[in-house]
């Protein structure tokens, strides 16, 4: 039986911490930023934790 491959798109978008949480980047901070307020762009910085149901699906895609 061959090894399972992890989903390459998911592996680029998500990161699993040592404790098992799944982190993602917040959407909406790539381009078209000049009309967005500083408050919005500041709120979009940093990583967010995935909801438990979604995290289970992502872990399956990553083979964890």
From Swiss-Prot:
TM stretches of this protein: none
Keywords, comma-separated and alphabetical: Ribonucleoprotein, Ribosomal protein
Superkingdom of source: Bacteria
UniProt-listed InterPro entries: Ribosomal_bL35, Ribosomal_bL35-like, Ribosomal_bL35_CS, Ribosomal_bL35_sf
Example of a GO biological process term: translation
Keyword Protease: no
Gene Ontology terms, MF aspect: structural constituent of ribosome
Gene Ontology CC entries for this record: cytosolic large ribosomal subunit
Family: Belongs to the bacterial ribosomal protein bL35 family.
UniProt cross-references to NCBIfam families, sorted A to Z: rpmI_bact (TIGR00001)
Name recorded for this polypeptide: Large ribosomal subunit protein bL35
Organism: Streptomyces coelicolor (strain ATCC BAA-471 / A3(2) / M145)
Gene: rpmI
């Amino acid at each position: 039986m061959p090894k399972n491959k992890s989903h390459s798109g998911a592996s680029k978008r998500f990161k699993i911490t040592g404790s098992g949480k799944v982190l993602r980047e917040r959407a909406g901070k790539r381009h078209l930023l000049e009309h967005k307020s500083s408050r919005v762009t500041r709120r979009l910085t940093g990583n967010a934790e995935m909801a438990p149901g979604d995290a289970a699906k992502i872990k399956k895609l990553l083979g964890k």
